């Protein structure tokens, strides 16, 4: 099995958004962060042989990271058809043979029922854009309804919200850690070539 560093290298070929939409907060998950999240999930036996669901897969970074760690299958959900098409191409670049089901759908209104235990991995919208406040709440509601365990990336300072949401919806935060998230200049309101934003990653166990 690849080490975390090797997994990061495998994910370095994943192409990002061709035409990112600021309103949808389409920022590619950095390979280093994706590898860290997937490696942690693997250490907890939450990937191998399981069904993994990536809500808001974008161009497939977390989906493909999970696919490289031996799951039974991965279900990748994305509302925007353009990055989803890029994700399908990224699968070819990465070279995984794990079954991946690409689903163009709203992750906050998931149109399927999954009978087996599910691990969710996701980097949802942070709700940083005007009118998008609390955008990750809808994603978490889906997680609470389908997952037995989840790994999700959120804006720094989300601890109280995440813990309260988990408590109210049959979940328990078991692990949390800070992580740097490098954002490239891809929108008109970005002044720097790139910048780092502070994020937090949460592992939550759910009873549903």
PLM segments and residue spans:
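Conserved SAM-binding loop
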Residues: 87-88
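Conserved SAM-binding strand-loop segment of SAM-dependent methyltransferases
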Residues: 96-107
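Conserved S-adenosyl-L-methionine
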Residues: 56
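S-adenosyl-L-methionine
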Residues: 1-53, 62
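Conserved SAM-binding loop of SAM-dependent methyltransferases across substrates and taxa
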Residues: 59-71
């Amino acid at each position: 099995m690849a080490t975390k560093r090797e997994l990061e290298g495998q994910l370095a070929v994943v192409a990002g958004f061709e035409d990112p939409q600021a309103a949808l907060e389409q920022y590619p998950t950095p390979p280093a962060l994706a590898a860290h999240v997937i490696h942690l999930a693997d250490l907890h036996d939450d990937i191998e042989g399981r069904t993994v669901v990536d809500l808001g897969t974008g161009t497939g970074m977390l989906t493909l990271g999970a696919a490289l760690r031996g799951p039974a299958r991965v279900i990748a959900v994305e509302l925007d058809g353009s990055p989803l098409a890029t994700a399908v191409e990224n699968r070819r670049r990465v070279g995984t043979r794990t079954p991946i089901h690409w689903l163009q759908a709203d992750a906050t209104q998931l149109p399927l029922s999954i009978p087996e235990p599910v691990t969710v991995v996701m980097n949802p919208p942070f709700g940083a854009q005007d009118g998008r406040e609390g955008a990750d709440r809808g994603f978490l509601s889906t997680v609470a309804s389908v997952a037995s365990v989840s790994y999700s990336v959120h804006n720094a300072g989300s601890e109280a919200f995440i813990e309260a949401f988990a408590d109210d919806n049959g979940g328990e935060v078991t692990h949390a850690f800070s992580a740097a998230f490098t954002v490239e200049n891809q929108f008109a309101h970005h002044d720097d070539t790139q910048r780092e934003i502070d994020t937090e990653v949460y592992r939550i166990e759910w009873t549903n």
